UniProtKB/Swiss-Prot annotation:
This is Prokineticin-2. It is linked to Hypogonadotropic hypogonadism 4 with or without anosmia: A disorder characterized by absent or incomplete sexual maturation by the age of 18 years, in conjunction with low levels of circulating gonadotropins and testosterone and no other abnormalities of the hypothalamic-pituitary axis. In some cases, it is associated with non-reproductive phenotypes, such as anosmia, cleft palate, and sensorineural hearing loss. Anosmia or hyposmia is related to the absence or hypoplasia of the olfactory bulbs and tracts. It comes from Homo sapiens. Keywords: Biological rhythms, Disease variant, Disulfide bond, Hypogonadotropic hypogonadism, Kallmann syndrome, Neuropeptide, Secreted, Signal. Disulfide bonds join 34-46, 40-58, 45-107, 68-115, 109-125. Residues 1-27 form the signal peptide. GO terms for biological process: angiogenesis; chemotaxis; circadian rhythm; endothelial cell proliferation; G protein-coupled receptor signaling pathway; inflammatory response; negative regulation of apoptotic process; neuropeptide signaling pathway. The gene is PROK2. Belongs to the AVIT (prokineticin) family. SUPFAM superfamilies: Colipase-like (SSF57190). Induction: Activated by CLOCK and BMAL1 heterodimers and light; inhibited by period genes (PER1, PER2 and PER3) and cryptochrome genes (CRY1 and CRY2).
Length: 129
């Protein structure tokens, strides 16, 4: 008998979510999906999505004042091998298009800007000196 008096309450709790759920077949469409920088337009790069890590999307390059991510986090302790690697890396282009797979959700800064540290763990696109 008790279960019969709870039935209307249960129906009131379950009915609104059923009415608000989308019909079968509705899905999100992700525009701007990419695999490489060359698939994105000018001023954009192919970066990891902030919401779904397995998807890469065309993302605008950093403008003045935008937060950014440094190209490397490795410490340089000054031994010869690391110095040679650093010189070799500095010769490589660090611009868009990048032919590898980006591992972060931000793009490099626009040309003429650099990703500079402003506090312990914060980097911002600022004018190069």
């Amino acid at each position: 008998m008790r279960s019969l008096c709870c039935a209307p309450l249960l129906l009131l709790l379950l009915l609104p979510p059923l009415l608000l759920t989308p019909r079968a077949g509705d899905a999100a469409v992700i525009t701007g999906a990419c695999d490489k920088d060359s698939q994105c337009g000018g001023g954009m790069c192919c970066a990891v999505s902030i919401w779904v890590k397995s998807i890469r999307i065309c993302t605008p390059m950093g403008k003045l004042g935008d937060s950014c991510h440094p190209l490397t986090r490795k410490n340089n302790f000054g031994n010869g091998r690391q110095e040679r690697r650093k010189r070799k890396r500095s010769k490589r282009k660090k611009e868009v298009p990048f032919f590898g797979r980006r591992m972060h959700h931000t793009c490099p800064c626009l040309p003429g800007l650099a990703c500079l540290r402003t506090s312990f763990n914060r980097f911002i696109c600022l004018a190069q000196k």
